[in-house]
């Protein structure tokens, strides 16, 4: 199978969601992600795209720090108390 390269957007382009710093991320079809989603009551197949895992809001952009030492993502739905964030796109905090 061909591995898809993740597209990285400038952090400033995150206008549809929140900037989040996530410990890891994976495709919604990955076994570890589907297990996690099922564990919080989301039906398998109801979530698509990139999912952030163990996320917190990024603050301090433009204040001289990167604001995230893990994976910086722009996510459209982070209403699961930081456990997962849905609809994510990787972002570059330096752009």
From Swiss-Prot:
Keyword Glycoprotein: yes
Job of this protein: Aerial growth, conidiation, and dispersal of filamentous fungi in the environment rely upon a capability of their secreting small amphipathic proteins called hydrophobins (HPBs) with low sequence identity. Class I can self-assemble into an outermost layer of rodlet bundles on aerial cell surfaces, conferring cellular hydrophobicity that supports fungal growth, development and dispersal; whereas Class II form highly ordered films at water-air interfaces through intermolecular interactions but contribute nothing to the rodlet structure.
Keywords, sorted A to Z: Cell wall, Disulfide bond, Glycoprotein, Secreted
Protein species of origin: Pleurotus ostreatus (strain PC15) (Oyster mushroom)
Known glycosylation sites: 23, 77
Subcellular location(s) per record: Secreted; Secreted, Cell wall
Cellular component, GO, one term: extracellular region
Complex and partners: Self-assembles to form functional amyloid fibrils called rodlets. Self-assembly into fibrillar rodlets occurs spontaneously at hydrophobic:hydrophilic interfaces and the rodlets further associate laterally to form amphipathic monolayers.
Molecular function in Gene Ontology: structural constituent of cell wall
Domain of life: Eukaryota
Pfam families: Hydrophobin
Disulfide bonds: 14-74, 21-68, 22-55, 75-88
Family: Belongs to the fungal hydrophobin family.
Record protein name field: Class I hydrophobin 13
């Amino acid at each position: 199978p061909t591995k898809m390269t993740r597209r990285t957007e400038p952090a400033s382009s995150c206008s549809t969601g929140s900037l989040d710093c996530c410990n890891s991320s994976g495709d919604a079809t990955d076994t570890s992600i589907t297990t996690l989603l099922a564990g919080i009551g989301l039906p398998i197949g109801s979530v698509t795209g990139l999912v952030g895992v163990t996320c917190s809001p990024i603050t301090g952009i433009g204040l001289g720090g990167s604001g995230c030492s893990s994976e910086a993502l722009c996510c459209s739905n982070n209403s699961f108390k930081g456990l997962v964030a849905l609809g994510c796109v990787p972002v570059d905090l330096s752009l």
